[in-house]
Regions:
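Positively charged, small/polar-rich N-terminal and surface patches that mediate targeting and assembly
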Residues: 2-118
């Protein structure tokens, strides 16, 4: 077992992983989360092979893997919204901390997650 030690201030940003049953479902969820400013971007990886336990059996499915960039403060809303939009009973929604990145990318990420000024 190990732990990550941050020197200085930790990054408040996350990479959120999700799988979806189809490209159409993944696109619908990502576009909704973008419109609601819960994510800054989403990347889709088509046709990953997933193996998992479900109802006492080992299952295999082709799924779409989605990487989304968001923030710690938006994760609960994002997770709740994915649960509302997703077709799975138990959708995969995992958050990984971003420990570092290029300054320009992190500034862009922050700007995308701020409310739109009218």
């Amino acid at each position: 077992h190990y732990s990550i030690v941050f020197v200085g201030e930790s990054m408040p940003y996350l990479i959120v992983l999700m799988t979806a049953s189809s490209r159409e479902e993944a696109v619908k969820i990502v576009r909704t989360l973008l419109e609601e400013r819960l994510i800054a971007c989403g990347n889709l990886v088509d046709s990953v092979s997933s193996f998992f336990w479900w109802k006492g059996e080992i299952e295999e499915e082709k799924e779409v893997l989605v990487f989304m960039k968001s923030s710690e403060k938006l994760f609960k809303k994002l997770s709740k919204r994915v649960g509302e939009l997703h077709s799975y009973d138990v959708p995969e929604i995992l958050a990984l901390p971003i420990v570092d990145g290029s300054q320009s990318y992190l500034e862009w990420l922050k700007s995308c997650l701020e409310p739109v000024k009218e």
